[in-house]
Amino acid sequence: MNELIEIEVVYGRPDKQVLLSLSVPVGSTLEDCIKLSGITTHFPEIIPSEAMVGIFSRADKLSSIVKAGDRIEIYRPLTADPKEMRKLRAAKMSKK
């Protein structure tokens, strides 16, 4: 008999956030859980096989196995290069 564990899948945009709780079979990967959650019905822009993901704010691989109680977070792509943004802020501060 396939044992089930409880996990959560979360994703958010500035205008909408969703947290889904679900039961998945032991041995499921992060990618499996994203697909099983149905979160793509809320956010069609998510491509499960290409998503950047993590568990409790720590980046992880789609092939990682989940544990009971894990919160799988799907991350949005960066809109700006962090290094460039730091340079711009530093330049702005030096002008003051």
From Swiss-Prot:
Matching InterPro entries: Mopterin_synth/thiamin_S_b, RnfH, RnfH_sf
Transmembrane annotation, as ranges: none
UniProt-listed Pfam families: Ub-RnfH (PF03658)
Coiled coil regions, renumbered to chain: none
Family: Belongs to the UPF0125 (RnfH) family.
HAMAP family xref list: UPF0125_RnfH
NCBIfam families in alphabetical order: PRK01777.1
Name of the protein in question: Protein RnfH
Species whose genome carries this gene: Psychromonas ingrahamii (strain DSM 17664 / CCUG 51855 / 37)
